[in-house]
């Protein structure tokens, strides 16, 4: 199971709920989740926010699920 699907299930969200949270069409979201389509930077950002994780976690650059603390983000 990929990280996107794993996080969605952990949160108890449906694909329709993800559409509502991100604005990504449900059919496109399904393709992202099943690896049939790559997400754009903007889609990755929206997904990370909706799932309360970091973009790095979604793209397998880290194993840390939690998003970076706000104090380390640029303003």
Residue ranges, per PLM feature:
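DNA major-groove recognition helix of helix-turn-helix
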Residues: 33, 43, 59-62
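A short, Lys/Arg-rich alpha-helix, primarily the initiator
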Residues: 1-10
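DNA major-groove recognition helix of helix-turn-helix/homeodomain DNA-binding modules
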Residues: 23, 42-57
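Helix-turn-helix DNA-binding elements, focusing on the entry/boundary residues of the two helices
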Residues: 4, 15, 26, 41-44
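Short, charged recognition helix plus adjacent turn
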Residues: 10, 49, 59-75
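Short alpha-helical DNA-recognition segment
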Residues: 12-34
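The alpha-helix within a helix-turn-helix
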Residues: 8, 19, 48
């Amino acid at each position: 199971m990929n990280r996107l699907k794993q996080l969605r299930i952990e949160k108890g969200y449906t694909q329709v709920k993800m559409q509502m949270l991100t604005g990504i069409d449900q059919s496109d979201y399904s393709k992202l989740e099943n690896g049939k389509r790559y997400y754009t930077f903007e889609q990755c950002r929206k997904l990370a926010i909706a799932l309360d994780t970091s973009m790095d976690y979604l793209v397998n650059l880290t194993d840390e699920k939690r998003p970076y603390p706000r104090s380390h983000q640029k303003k």
